[in-house]
A protein has these predicted regions:
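Catalytic-core regions built around general acid/base machinery
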Residues: 145-161
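Active-site environment of divalent metal-dependent phosphoester hydrolases
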Residues: 42, 143-145, 168-172
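Conserved residues at the C-terminal ends of beta-strands
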Residues: 109, 139-141, 188
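Distinct, well-ordered alpha-helical segments
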Residues: 45, 149-150, 170-177
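Active-site core segment of subtilase-fold serine proteases
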Residues: 4-5, 9-135, 154, 161, ...
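Active-site neighborhood of phospho(di)ester-bond hydrolases with catalytic His/Asp-centered motifs
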Residues: 137-139, 162-166, 185
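Extracellular S/T/G-rich loop segment that most often corresponds to the catalytic His/Ser-adjacent loop
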Residues: 37, 47, 158, 174-205
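Active-site metal-binding loops of divalent metal-dependent hydrolases
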Residues: 38, 166-167
């Protein structure tokens, strides 16, 4: 049932047709989803971590610098990892669309820096692609584009790249969402209308 599977509000399930999707598959451990972000709680009991890397601090611990705080929870990266691949039917947290998929956690923010910014996007994307990512999720962005990152993405035609449109309610194209071969994703509300904060332009999904 949808209750035991744990995904939240009914409209969210209907919007993405999660019930129909779950009837087809609950995901596969053969699929590796890379989360490029400010850290992923690597011992979270609702996530299966396949590999992890802190490309900013050059170590193999992708956990956030501040492991948990009341306002930020388990970090933005952990939140994104849960949406992508939280386990299904385990009585914990939410259920994602592909709960059997495994996470490649890539921390691209130095522990000494502001946890709200991504500093090493290129290195994070490259490491994820070199270490088995089938999907690369990038929930960050700015108006600055990089030819080097575009070329890097082009070098991995078999990888699906997904990026956030941004949360500033502007039509400005943000990157990495604006790169070629990247699926840019905006936000909608409970009425399937653009969320008040979501960036918007013709290239978004």
């Amino acid at each position: 049932s949808s209750t035991s599977r744990g995904l939240g509000d009914v409209y969210k399930r209907q919007l993405v047709d999660s019930e129909d999707a779950w009837d087809i598959t609950l995901g596969s451990s053969n699929i590796k989803v890379a989360i490029i972000d400010n850290g992923v709680a690597n011992n979270h009991n609702d996530l299966t971590i396949y590999k992890q890397r802190d490309v900013s601090d050059n170590d193999n611990d992708a956990s956030p610098a501040v492991y948990y705080n009341q306002n930020g929870g388990w970090s933005h990266g952990t939140h994104c990892a849960g949406l992508a691949a939280a386990d299904i039917n385990n009585g914990t947290g939410i259920a994602s669309l592909g709960g059997n998929a495994e996470i490649i956690a890539v921390k691209a923010t130095p522990s000494s820096a502001d946890g709200g910014s991504i500093y090493n996007s290129y290195n994070g994307i490259q490491w994820a692609c070199e270490n088995g990512a089938n999907v690369v999720s990038m929930s960050y962005g700015s108006a600055n584009q990089s030819e080097a990152i575009q070329n890097l993405i082009n070098n991995y035609p078999d990888v699906i790249f997904i990026a956030a449109a941004g949360n500033d309610n502007v039509s400005t194209i943000f990157y990495p969402a604006g790169y070629q071969n990247v699926i840019g994703v905006g936000s909608v509300d409970g009425n399937d209308l653009k969320s008040s904060f979501s960036n918007y332009n013709a290239g978004l999904f």
